[in-house]
Curated annotation (Swiss-Prot):
Cellular component per GO, a single term: cytosol
Tagged with keyword Cytoplasm: yes
Family membership: Belongs to the lyase 1 family. Argininosuccinate lyase subfamily.
EC identifiers of the protein: 4.3.2.1
Enzyme class: lyase
Protein name: Argininosuccinate lyase
Associated pathway: Amino-acid biosynthesis; L-arginine biosynthesis; L-arginine from L-ornithine and carbamoyl phosphate: step 3/3
C-alpha cells in the first residue's frame, strides 16, 4: 500500500507505477533507511510520541530487519513497494503491527531520503579513500622497486628529458592525493544531518536535532529545513571528484597502454589483466587499462546529468531529485572498480630496464643540459637555446647523439664548449642536476618515496 493513498479516489495506473517506483535502485539505501529509522525512534521518545518500551520493540524489529537485509539485499527486489522507505515501513508493520505505523510521526520521506543518501555517501567516501590509499601504496612500492630505471619523459608525446620510472609513479601518487583530499573536503561538508527537517518547513515536534545528529554519527544538524531537503550538493561534489579522479586514472591507463605497446615496449602487463584476440593468436591486449580509460565518460555523464537535474528546480523537494540515485550509485561503483583495477594492474607489472634506457638515449633529451652548460659558460639562455637547436639539427644530419659529437664538431656552433661537456651529457648527470624539491634526481625521488611511505602507513 502506498504511504500517501488517502487523498486519492482512483488507483494508480500500472504504467505510472512502473515509471514512478524507485525500489529497483534505491533498495541500496536499505541499511541507511533502517539505521536512520532507529535513530528517529529514539528521538520520538524524547517528545513522548513513543514510550521507552515501544521504542525498544521498534529498534529490535528494525535491527532484525537490518540483519535480514545484510544477508540478502536482493530479496528486497521481490517486493512491489514504491520505494525503500515504503518497504522498510511495511516490513516493520509486518513484524510489530500497528506500533510500526507510529514511526513516521513528524518525519517526511523528503528528510528521510536526504538522510539516507548522505549516510550512503559518507560510507562510500570512506571505502573510496581506502581503495585510493591502496593504489597509492602500490604506486609507491612500484616506484621503490624501479628507482634506477631511466626512461624518457615526454611533452607533446615527444621525448623531452630523461626521468625515472619511479618519478613517473610518484606523479600519480600526487594526483591521487589531491583526489583523496577532495573526498575529505566533501565529507566534511556532507557531515550534517537533515533528519528533522520534515517535508520542507521542519518537524512539528520539539526534537533535539543536534542530539539526533550525534546519534546518527553526524558532526551537526543542518541549519535550514528548506535547504536540507533540497540539497544534493554532496552528490554533485562526489560526482565532480569522481570525474576528475577518473580523468587521472584515464591518464594512468593511457600511459600504460603506450608503455605496453610494441612500439615502446617499456612494460609488460600480466596475463591476468590482458586478453587475446579471437582472430589473431599473437595478440595480448591491455583491456584492463582500456576499460579504465573508456569508463570516464560514464562517470562524467552522471555528473552532467545531475547538474542538469538540479539547475532549474524550485525549492524544495521535487520528484526530479529521484534521478540522483542511479547516477551516483553507478558512478561511484565504476570509480571504485577502476581504482581497484589500477592497483591490480600494477601488481605484476614488468619494467624493461634496457628498453627504457635505450629510448631515453634517443631523441636528444640531453639538449637542455647542453643549453644550461652554455649558460654556465656565460652565454645568455636565448643564445644558448639557439646554438643547441642548430647543434641538434647537425647531429640528426650526421646520425649522432650529442654525446657522440667531437669537440671540433661542437666548435662549429660555439667555442664556449669544452671537454667537460661530456660529463653533463650523460643520462645520470641529466637526472642528478634536477635536484630541487620535486625534481627527478634519484636523491629527491628517494626522499619522496620515503615521505609517502610514512604518510600511507
Amino acid at each position: 500500500m502506498a504511504l500517501w493513498g488517502g487523498r486519492f479516489t482512483q488507483a494508480t495506473d500500472k504504467r505510472f507505477k512502473d515509471f514512478n517506483d524507485s525500489l529497483r535502485f534505491d533498495y541500496r539505501l536499505a541499511e541507511q533507511d533502517i539505521e536512520g529509522s532507529i535513530g528517529w525512534s529514539k528521538a520520538l521518545v524524547t517528545v513522548n510520541v513513543l514510550t521507552q518500551q515501544e521504542q525498544q520493540v521498534l529498534e529490535n524489529a528494525l535491527s532484525e530487519l537490518l540483519i535480514e537485509v545484510r544477508s540478502n539485499p536482493q530479496k528486497i527486489l521481490q517486493d512491489d513497494a514504491e520505494d525503500i522507505h515504503s518497504w522498510v515501513e511495511s516490513k516493520l508493520i509486518d513484524k510489530v503491527g500497528n506500533l510500526g505505523k507510529k514511526l513516521h510521526t513528524g518525519r517526511s520521506r523528503n528528510d528521510q531520503v536526504a538522510l539516507d543518501i548522505k549516510m550512503w555517501c559518507k560510507q562510500r567516501v570512506t571505502e573510496l579513500q581506502h581503495s585510493m590509499r591502496e593504489l597509492q601504496r602500490k604506486l609507491v612500492e612500484t616506484a621503490e622497486h624501479n628507482q634506477h630505471v631511466v626512461m624518457p619523459g615526454y611533452t607533446h608525446l615527444q621525448r623531452a628529458q630523461p626521468i625515472t620510472f619511479a618519478h613517473w609513479c610518484m606523479a600519480y601518487v600526487e594526483m591521487l592525493d589531491r583526489d583523496y583530499g577532495r573526498l575529505q573536503d566533501a565529507y566534511q561538508r556532507m557531515n550534517t544531518c537533515p533528519l528533522g527537517s520534515g517535508a520542507l518547513a521542519g518537524t512539528a515536534y520539539a526534537i533535539d536535532r543536534d542530539l539526533l545528529a550525534q546519534d546518527l554519527d553526524f558532526a551537526m544538524a543542518t541549519r535550514n529545513s528548506l535547504d536540507s531537503v533540497s540539497d544534493r550538493d554532496h552528490i554533485i561534489e562526489l560526482l565532480s571528484t569522481a570525474s576528475l579522479s577518473m580523468a587521472h586514472l584515464s591518464r594512468f591507463a593511457e600511459d600504460m597502454i603506450i608503455f605496453n605497446s610494441g612500439e615502446a615496449d617499456f612494460v609488460e602487463l600480466s596475463d591476468r589483466v590482458t586478453s587475446g584476440s579471437s582472430l589473431m593468436p599473437q595478440k595480448k591486449n591491455p583491456d584492463a587499462c582500456e576499460l579504465i580509460r573508456g569508463k570516464v565518460g560514464r562517470v562524467v555523464g552522471a555528473l552532467t546529468g545531475m547538474l542538469m537535474t538540479v539547475k532549474g528546480l524550485p525549492l524544495a523537494y521535487n520528484k526530479d531529485m529521484q534521478e540522483d540515485k542511479e547516477g551516483i550509485f553507478d558512478a561511484l561503483d565504476t570509480w571504485q572498480d577502476c581504482v581497484d583495477m589500477a592497483t591490480f594492474v600494477l601488481e605484476d607489472i614488468k619494467v624493461s630496464v634496457e628498453r627504457t634506457k635505450e629510448a631515453a638515449l634517443k631523441g636528444y633529451s640531453n639538449s637542455t643540459e647542453l643549453a644550461d652548460y652554455l649558460v654556465a659558460k656565460g652565454v645568455p639562455f636565448r643564445d644558448s637555446h639557439h646554438i643547441v637547436g642548430e647543434t641538434v639539427v647537425y647531429a640528426i644530419k650526421v646520425h649522432k647523439g650529442l654525446e657522440d659529437l667531437s669537440i671540433e664538431e661542437f666548435h662549429q656552433f660555439s667555442n664556449a664548449i669544452e671537454e667537460d661537456v661530456y660529463e653533463i651529457l650523460s643520462l645520470q648527470s641529466c637526472l642528478d642536476k634536477r635536484c630541487a624539491k620535486g625534481g627527478v634526481s634519484p636523491l629527491r625521488v628517494a626522499e619522496a618515496i620515503a615521505e609517502a611511505k610514512k604518510r600511507f602507513k
